[in-house]
């Protein structure tokens, strides 16, 4: 007797999906949420540098200058730069003994 005759092969019915209530609204909603979660996770991993850099630094740019005349923009830049510039005479040299 051959060994091949003793081996059982799976029938087609065993490989089919056994979920009879896959049209249940809860199952459909869970599937949609799962797919959306996967898509968002992939996008997050692909663009995380852009997204988090925009959130971290994009909100700290200061007031928008859209619609402001160029002369006022230049004046604002000069005020900001003068606030940053420091005269060397203001520093105090402290020597520790």
UniProtKB/Swiss-Prot annotation:
GO annotation, cellular component aspect: host cell plasma membrane; membrane; virion membrane
Residues covalently joined to lipid (S-palmitoyl cysteine): 50
TM segment ranges: 23-43
Top-level taxon in the UniProt lineage: Viruses
Regulation: The M2 protein from most influenza A strains is inhibited by amantadine and rimantadine, resulting in viral uncoating incapacity. Emergence of amantadine-resistant variants is usually rapid.
GO biological process, one term: protein complex oligomerization
UniProt-recorded Gene Ontology molecular function terms: monoatomic ion channel activity; proton transmembrane transporter activity
Region spans: Disordered: 60-83
Membrane disposition: Single-pass type III membrane protein
Record bears the keyword Disulfide bond: yes
Gene3D superfamilies attached to this UniProt entry: 6.10.250.1640
Positions on the Virion surface side per record topology: 1-22
Keywords: Disulfide bond, Host cell membrane, Host membrane, Host-virus interaction, Hydrogen ion transport, Inhibition of host autophagy by virus, Ion channel, Ion transport, Lipoprotein, Membrane, Palmitate, Phosphoprotein, Signal-anchor, Transmembrane, Transmembrane helix, Transport, Viral ion channel, Virion
Record-annotated site: Essential for channel activity, possibly by being protonated during channel activation, and by forming the channel gate and the selective filter: 37
Intravirion side stretches: 44-97
Site entry: Seems to be involved in pH gating: 41
Function text: Forms a proton-selective ion channel that is necessary for the efficient release of the viral genome during virus entry. After attaching to the cell surface, the virion enters the cell by endocytosis. Acidification of the endosome triggers M2 ion channel activity.
Family classification: Belongs to the influenza viruses matrix protein M2 family.
Note in the entry: When the channel is activated, one or more imidazole moieties of His-37 probably become bi-protonated.
Comment on protein domains: Cytoplasmic tail plays an important role in virion assembly and morphogenesis.
Quaternary state and interactors: Homotetramer; composed of two disulfide-linked dimers held together by non-covalent interactions. May interact with matrix protein 1.
The protein's name in its UniProt record: Matrix protein 2
């Amino acid at each position: 007797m051959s060994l091949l005759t003793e081996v059982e092969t799976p029938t087609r019915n065993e490989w089919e999906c056994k979920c009879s209530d896959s049209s249940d609204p809860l199952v459909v909603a869970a599937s949609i949420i799962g797919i959306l979660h996967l898509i968002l996770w992939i996008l997050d991993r692909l663009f995380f540098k852009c997204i988090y850099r925009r959130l971290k630094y994009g909100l700290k740019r200061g007031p928008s200058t859209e619609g402001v005349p160029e002369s006022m923009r230049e004046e604002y830049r000069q005020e900001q730069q003068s606030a940053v510039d420091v005269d060397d005479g203001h520093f105090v040299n402290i020597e520790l003994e």
